[in-house]
């Protein structure tokens, strides 16, 4: 088999392939075997009819068609591998010549990963917020903990912000009752904003047994986007009494004996959260600077596939009715044109990010260990509230294990850029990224330690 590659654009190639018929013998054997199982000829047991008689029955053209259809995928893959083509997406294959007994020729056009010129990562400089742990932040955490251990007590007064109420709701749109917006005995924390917009403002000042009408725009159901008249009736009013800030509370709410020990632990927790937040900000800003400075040609077919996927997700809950989507967007003050524009921009950014990080990973020989892959799977399973075994089965059935692997590899590629970049906070202090992300030296030492342990075993 011979193959040549034509570069059609920075992101697309045409592979020209020639396959001598002598190399198709196994494909012919497979085709004849399949036909022998399907066709019964007098005097021959099933599967034993000779090739020439089978060919006489179905015609040479049908045999050639079967052989070519079976041969194309494997010969295409072989050509891609031998040429070192980094193909992405599905190819467009066209058979250009069949000389029976002599030669099969076909072409395959496919999108490829573009060549990307990477910058010197040490030239990247970003500025992030400093890690600040204030007394107010500690008190906020302590208040949240006290609220968890608070008790609710019924009160005979008007509703105030922060109270807990039991309410009945009903709504109408143009005089029509909205069934999905009708409920009785709903528990609600006033000021949380967790139910209908405008509800908190309406019930503050009401007493148990009193009602009030207000208008609100419904966000779901048959009347999504419509303005409704909502009636709320307060059934009960309760206030939350908080435990005192003392050693007794510390012993109740934690493993510590004193309030000061509890506050010290809360300070450490806040510090960990602030470090995670700062690490996220560093990653985001480094990636943003990479995307702004590095030129990445985008494969049109890959971008289009992401745009199509966004549209599919949007209409999935609307019985795949695009007119229903257009109507919903209009009711939300948007339009199909804006939706398409946003989907296009999001797809272009997503594809550019993937190609760029893959290129960085290739240049840095970034690898992903089994432990790293397992850690990511366990993290995602916990995030979705699923058992790890169930989550693994789900991603395997959806052929998404490769996507998880690629995601981990891209994350490591970005971390390698962060390691080389210059990072300061807004006060001018240099941020030690190794403390937040680790370093390549740490990873090398860990790999060496793992190898040594394996040898000891």
Swiss-Prot record:
Catalytic activity: [protein]-peptidylproline (omega=180) = [protein]-peptidylproline (omega=0)
EC number assigned by the record: 5.2.1.8
Bias kind Acidic residues: ranges: 440-457
Aminoacyl-tRNA synthetase recorded as keyword: no
InterPro entries: PPIase_dom_sf (IPR046357), PPIase_FKBP_dom (IPR001179), Trig_fac (IPR005215), Trigger_fac_C (IPR008880), Trigger_fac_C_sf (IPR037041), Trigger_fac_ribosome-bd_bac (IPR008881), Trigger_fac_ribosome-bd_sf (IPR036611), Trigger_fact/SurA_dom_sf (IPR027304)
Keyword line: Cell cycle, Cell division, Chaperone, Cytoplasm, Isomerase, Rotamase
Protein localization: Cytoplasm
Pfam families, A to Z: FKBP_C, Trigger_C, Trigger_N
Domain PPIase FKBP-type: 162-243
GO BP, sorted A to Z: 'de novo' cotranslational protein folding; cell division; chaperone-mediated protein folding; protein transport; protein unfolding
Region (Disordered): 434-457
Job description of the protein: Involved in protein export. Acts as a chaperone by maintaining the newly synthesized protein in an open conformation. Functions as a peptidyl-prolyl cis-trans isomerase.
Classification via NCBIfam families: tig
Family under the similarity heading: Belongs to the FKBP-type PPIase family. Tig subfamily.
Protein name, as recorded: Trigger factor
Lineage: Bacteria, Bacillati, Actinomycetota, Actinomycetes, Mycobacteriales
Name of the gene encoding the protein in the UniProt record: tig
């Amino acid at each position: 088999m011979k193959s040549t590659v034509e570069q059609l654009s920075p992101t697309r190639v045409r592979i020209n392939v020639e396959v001598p018929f002598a190399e198709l013998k196994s494909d012919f054997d497979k085709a004849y075997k399949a036909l022998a199982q399907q066709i019964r000829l007098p005097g021959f047991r099933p599967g034993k009819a000779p090739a020439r008689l089978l060919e006489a029955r179905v015609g040479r053209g049908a045999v050639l068609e079967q052989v070519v259809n079976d041969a194309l995928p494997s010969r295409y893959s072989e050509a891609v591998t031998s040429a070192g083509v980094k193909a992405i997406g599905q190819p467009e294959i066209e058979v250009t010549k069949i000389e029976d007994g002599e030669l099969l020729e076909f072409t395959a056009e496919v999108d490829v990963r573009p060549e990307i010129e990477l910058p010197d990562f040490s030239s990247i400089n970003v500025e992030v917020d400093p890690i600040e742990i204030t007394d107010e932040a500690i008190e906020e955490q302590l208040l949240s903990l006290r609220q968890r251990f608070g008790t609710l007590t019924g009160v005979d007064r008007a509703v105030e912000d922060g109270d807990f109420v039991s309410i009945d709701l009903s709504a109408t749109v143009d005089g029509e009752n909205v069934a999905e917006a009708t409920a009785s005995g709903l528990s609600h924390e006033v000021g949380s904003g967790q139910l209908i917009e405008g509800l908190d403002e309406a019930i503050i000042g009401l007493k148990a047994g009193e009602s009030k009408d207000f208008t609100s725009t419904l966000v779901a159901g048959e009347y999504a986007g419509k303005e409704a008249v909502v009636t709320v009736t307060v059934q009960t009013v309760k206030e939350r009494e908080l435990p005192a800030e003392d050693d007794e509370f510390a012993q109740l709410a934690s493993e510590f004996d004193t309030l000061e020990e509890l506050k010290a632990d809360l300070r450490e927790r806040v510090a960990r959260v602030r470090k995670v937040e700062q690490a996220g900000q560093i990653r985001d800003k480094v990636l943003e600077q990479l995307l702004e400075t590095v030129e990445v040609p985008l494969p049109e077919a890959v971008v289009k596939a992401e745009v199509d996927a966004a549209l599919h997700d949007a209409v999935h809950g609307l019985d795949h009715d695009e007119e229903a989507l257009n109507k919903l967007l209009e009711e939300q003050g948007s339009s199909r044109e804006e939706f398409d524009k946003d989907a296009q921009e999001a797809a272009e950014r997503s594809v550019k990010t993937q190609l760029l990080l893959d290129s960085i990973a290739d240049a840095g020989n970034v690898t992903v260990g089994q432990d790293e892959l397992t850690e990511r799977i366990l993290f995602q399973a916990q995030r979705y509230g699923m058992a790890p075994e169930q989550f693994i089965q789900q991603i395997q059935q959806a052929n998404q294990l490769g996507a998880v692997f690629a995601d981990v590899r891209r994350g490591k590629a970005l971390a390698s850029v962060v390691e080389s970049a210059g990072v300061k906070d807004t006060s001018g202090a240099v941020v030690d990224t190794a403390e937040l992300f680790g370093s390549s030296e740490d990873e090398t030492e860990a790999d060496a330690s793992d190898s040594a342990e394996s040898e000891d075993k």
